[in-house]
Amino acid sequence: MTEAPVHRGTRLSRGARRTQLLAAAREVFAAHGYHAAGMDGIAERAGVSKPVLYQHFPGKLELYRALLTASADELVDRVRSAIDSSTDNRERSRAAVAAYFDFVAGEGQAYRLVFESDLRGEPEAAAVVQSALTRCLDAIAAAVTTDAGLDPPRARLLAVGLVGLSQLGAQYWLDADRMVPRDEAVDLMARLAWGGLAGFPRIHDADQ
């Protein structure tokens, strides 16, 4: 369910206006893609004039980059919070899977900008997406390294597997009209992930 556009003339602080413009842009970009979206449509969706939009963003590319960065940072924050949510590896692996499902199912379809961008060939946009992936892998690999005692290359490979499983599973679940309830879908994917991770005993347990 989308929010109704703010009527023209509504006075907002600069920060609130920027947030409003980004929300409107996310809806337009998610619905039409970068190339088909226009500043006219974004301004109309936000309920502002084009000059107001250009006061905050000099062009469509800059607006897209700002939105992509915010969406990518949201994903990274979700994954980091999941890893930090528990010291139990099984709970952490489920939380990491759930982080991707919640990001994909979130309002505004921000995930489409990160995972399905039609601007992947633009260097700065590609760098933002790669940075988000790297930071997610860093968080998961660090936990695997600490708990399983694996060296960084092997821990990172496991992290890539968990990220791929979570991301693709969540996207398929959404594209398939959520064929099973969200919690059940998360449990299924988490059980698959844990079936692999459980094969690596915690180094702290091995030392006892």
Located regions from the model:
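Amphipathic alpha-helical packing segments from all-alpha helical-bundle domains
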Residues: 73-76, 123-148, 156-161, 168, ...
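Alpha-helical DNA-contacting segments of helix-turn-helix folds
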Residues: 37, 65-71, 129-132
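N-terminal intrinsically disordered/low-complexity leader segments
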Residues: 1-16, 201-208
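Helix-turn-helix
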Residues: 20, 24, 28-62, 66
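Hydrophobic alpha-helical connector segments
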Residues: 66, 80-109, 158-162, 186
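Short, charged helix-capping/linker segments at alpha-helix termini
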Residues: 35-36, 150-153
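Short, hydrophobic secondary-structure boundary micro-motifs
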Residues: 112-115, 182, 205-206
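Amphipathic alpha-helical segments used for helix-helix packing
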Residues: 103-127, 141, 168-175
